Amino acid sequence: MSNMEDRILSNTVRNEDYEIEGGLRPKFLNDYIGQDKVKERMKIFIEAALHRNEALDHVLLYGPPGLGKTTLSNIIANEMNVNIKITSGPVIERAGDLAAILTNLSENDVLFIDEIHRINRTVEEVLYPAMEDYALDIIIGKGPSARSIRLDLPKFTLIGATTRAGLLTGPLRDRFGVIAKLELYDTEQLKEIIRRSAYILNVYIDDNGAKEIASRSRGTPRIANRLLKRVRDFAQVRGDGRITLEIAQEALELLEIDLLGLDNTDKKMIETMIHNFGGGPVGLDTLAAATGEERNTIEDVYEPYLLQIGFINRTPRGRIVLEKAYNHFNIPFQK
């Protein structure tokens, strides 16, 4: 059984994140840090839609967890000055569930569906005319006497979010007019996010302390805000409440998060690949069985960051460990 949800470095949502993120989320694009190319495009699309007094075209946001897909969706609704309805793919079990949501939307509203790749195929087919024609096809009756009626819907914007864009069907993906990939953040962007969050939380943090937390946050704002909260606890109990470089280092060492933001779970993953499979190539299913992690967890949670920092590579034959990872964990590298 995976203990991924218990990790402080997990980029999936934990209960505490709702409390943290709720008060820290920016409300408008000008306050949204990072993802500059996506922001620039969205500003143009939003301004054009407002100028024409139309609903924004449907938007697909994809990328690793914790990068701000939900936040960006709320911002889009705020910028368009409309309401947002939030749901997720697994929650919409029947076509009737989706119909109830769609018929309760107002003109130009935003419907945000998280994990849209997990939506039921029957439900997905109801989405097609809703997205294309702003209409809902309903079957009345059964058997030979069954007939279809079409209900007009208010014009709306569907924002779909996914960590697995490759799992979307072609017909669904093709109905999104705007497709945007959210990238992992760099240290400077995360430092800015941490400074902003600390200000909102009324916590003093110096530049070096913010940079130290940022450098160990795996390129992910959700993790950065979570670590900030943990370091704040440490500063209040072991210090004077101020977060300095020294306090940040002590707190993160206590949490067993190394200089690159890796923990014992990452170390186990890399060491398993090296010691059990000679550094690879090793298939994803084999690696999942050897580490006790889910295949999807490895692909969505661990791999994006390990790929970004140059510790592993994906090949047609499987995953391989690169020399940089051997050096980091002090394991002799053999070509």
From Swiss-Prot:
Keywords: ATP-binding, Cytoplasm, DNA damage, DNA recombination, DNA repair, DNA-binding, Hydrolase, Nucleotide-binding. Residues 186-256 are annotated as: Small ATPAse domain (RuvB-S). InterPro entries: AAA+_ATPase (IPR003593), AAA_lid_4 (IPR041445), DNA_helicase_Holl-junc_RuvB (IPR004605), P-loop_NTPase (IPR027417), RuvB-like_N (IPR008824), RuvB_C (IPR008823), WH-like_DNA-bd_sf (IPR036388), WH_DNA-bd_sf (IPR036390). The keyword Glycoprotein does not apply. Its EC number is 3.6.4.-. Transmembrane segments: none annotated. Residues 1-185 are annotated as: Large ATPase domain (RuvB-L). One of its GO terms (cellular component) is Holliday junction resolvase complex. The keyword DNA-binding applies. Belongs to the RuvB family. Has 3 domains, the large (RuvB-L) and small ATPase (RuvB-S) domains and the C-terminal head (RuvB-H) domain. The head domain binds DNA, while the ATPase domains jointly bind ATP, ADP or are empty depending on the state of the subunit in the translocation cycle. During a single DNA translocation step the structure of each domain remains the same, but their relative positions change. Homohexamer. Forms an RuvA(8)-RuvB(12)-Holliday junction (HJ) complex. HJ DNA is sandwiched between 2 RuvA tetramers; dsDNA enters through RuvA and exits via RuvB. An RuvB hexamer assembles on each DNA strand where it exits the tetramer. Each RuvB hexamer is contacted by two RuvA subunits (via domain III) on 2 adjacent RuvB subunits; this complex drives branch migration. In the full resolvosome a probable DNA-RuvA(4)-RuvB(12)-RuvC(2) complex forms which resolves the HJ. This is Holliday junction branch migration complex subunit RuvB. It comes from Alkaliphilus oremlandii (strain OhILAs) (Clostridium oremlandii (strain OhILAs)).
